[in-house]
Amino acid sequence: MTTQFRNLIFEGGGVKGVAYIGAMQILENRGVLQDIRRVGGCSAGAINALIFALGYTVREQKEILQATDFNQFMDNSWGVIRDIRRLARDFGWNKGDFFSSWIGDLIHRRLGNRRATFKDLQKAKLPDLYVIGTNLSTGFAEVFSAERHPDMELATAVRISMSIPLFFAAVRHGDRQDVYVDGGVQLNYPIKLFDRERYIDLAKDPGAVRRTGYYNKENARFQLDRPGHSPYVYNRQTLGLRLDSREEIGLFRYDEPLKGKPIKSFTDYARQLFGALMNAQEKIHLHGDDWQRTIYIDTLDVGTTDFNLSDATKQALIEQGINGTENYFEWFDNPLEKPVNRVES
């Protein structure tokens, strides 16, 4: 069984995150989950990361997500005037209150306090949690964790991370009341989150470190400005999970060409332009070797905000999570392959 992994990363993807349940089933069967020390994610990935960090079993996670009516997340006021006022005041059509209550209940069940903080999670000796949010006031992504935000409520961090711009009301947070939205605006797939030496036990797992040219160049500059800080390394103990269409998986994993989509109207143009910008944002921080530590899951063309998921579609997504994870380990464990992220014993 594969037991080299210590860190899990979940990409954002709205309701498509249901597919992670299938992936988690395989990771559990392979003995991977028992060795996970840190978990991070964005948006739907942050929700899955939190549920895992709270200690819910994979079976419990499946029961939770299958029993959830995602339509209830769309908690607008059923009054256009009030919704328009919220859009102008809070920058979102839906309040996000139902989600906050839902996630608060899950936190309370495990930690006894729906307002539990990152520090409380750490005291419970559960896996460390890292949540990505976008601070629109500064224009940069932020990582919420016990390292820098010990007193931040877990529910607030995840509520920020899932706040799809304009779809959900933004969150004002901190002394300055900065405006925060979905972490996916800046960093939807934070696969490099644990690429620092400080996240590796060098005495016990020296093989987990992989030196790369791009990080060596970055460290040369970084160490001049901040000597003594933990250098960047490619962390072989990190495993990521992505939610992509079959065509995108073919491009990223196998370098297959994409089929073009017809652009016959301004709406087509705007949709494709927005998609191209989002694709560039998602890939700009990645390197060619990151796919080797990534499980790709086919999302069956389900949309991020397709909250009206049928039970059949939920099950189909779960099965895709199973298939994608099995395919990954079939490749990873093949002695004829040479994954750069494999720790050789």
Per-range role (PLM):
Residues 1-40, 50-345:
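Patatin-like phospholipase
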